[in-house]
């Protein structure tokens, strides 16, 4: 029997008198086939350390611990810690950290792996309400995670992996794809969770690029420009950029020159631009002193 078997999950929750907290976005997976598929997608073996976020009662952790060198699971809900100690008692390669992943000194914790030099993968069922902040925090942390295999709301997975000229493409697509390749591995129906969420989920596989997807003079400025370009999706690049930089004649003149230098029409919409085109635009705007 597995932790994720519905009867086991139910028994564990009843034994510990656990009640779900909406504020933590708790939905526990009760399908062992999907858990197996997640671990297979992540290609976990004993030469990999794993960071898990939101382990719940240990359903995914159990599958990870069977294969990985070590698993470090960050759980914000202190009520789940004794449950995890109980359900994972047979594993000596799991460390449960009762901390908020957004506030911990992750680099320091990683030094506590027995072999901190092994590649580190992030494998997790992320809370829907805070998926994007967690992902961007980890991606921008400077810690060289080689791969993420994470479950999230399908809509968010579609946005992250979207390509130009699609409805889902936006500043989040650019922010993630600058650092990583991103592809939806498979869909997870809402029916396999306790309690069932209101939407379906997706497993997103992201692999870190050896170098960022494009070269830019100023990364922060590049992200600001891409975000500004999607402020109002139905508006043109010109309208969004003047809304961000200002509408003085001096600014308009600089914008005109930058767009011309980048080879872009003022009437194009942000959703039509590739990462390379956003890089060219950001550098041209920077060159104009904006």
UniProtKB/Swiss-Prot annotation:
Q: What is its main location?
A: cytoplasm
UniProt cross-references to Gene3D superfamilies, sorted A to Z = Ribosomal RNA adenine dimethylase-like, domain 2, Vaccinia Virus protein VP39
User: Pfam families this protein is in?
Assistant: RrnaAD (PF00398)
Q: Which InterPro entries match?
A: KsgA/Erm (IPR001737), rRNA_Ade_diMease-like_C (IPR023165), rRNA_Ade_Mease_Trfase_CS (IPR020596), rRNA_Ade_methylase_Trfase_N (IPR020598), rRNA_adenine_dimethylase (IPR011530), SAM-dependent_MTases_sf (IPR029063)
Task: State if rRNA processing is listed as a keyword.
Answer: yes
Task: Write out the GO MF terms.
Answer: 16S rRNA (adenine(1518)-N(6)/adenine(1519)-N(6))-dimethyltransferase activity; RNA binding
Q: What is its EC number?
A: 2.1.1.182
- The domain of life for this entry's organism is Bacteria
| Disulphide connectivity of cysteines | none
Reaction(s) catalyzed by this protein?
Answer: adenosine(1518)/adenosine(1519) in 16S rRNA + 4 S-adenosyl-L-methionine = N(6)-dimethyladenosine(1518)/N(6)-dimethyladenosine(1519) in 16S rRNA + 4 S-adenosyl-L-homocysteine + 4 H(+)
Describe its function.
Specifically dimethylates two adjacent adenosines (A1518 and A1519) in the loop of a conserved hairpin near the 3'-end of 16S rRNA in the 30S particle. May play a critical role in biogenesis of 30S subunits.
Q: What is this protein called?
A: Ribosomal RNA small subunit methyltransferase A
What is the protein's species of origin? Answer: Streptococcus pneumoniae (strain Hungary19A-6)
Q: Lineage from the top down?
A: Bacteria, Bacillati, Bacillota, Bacilli, Lactobacillales
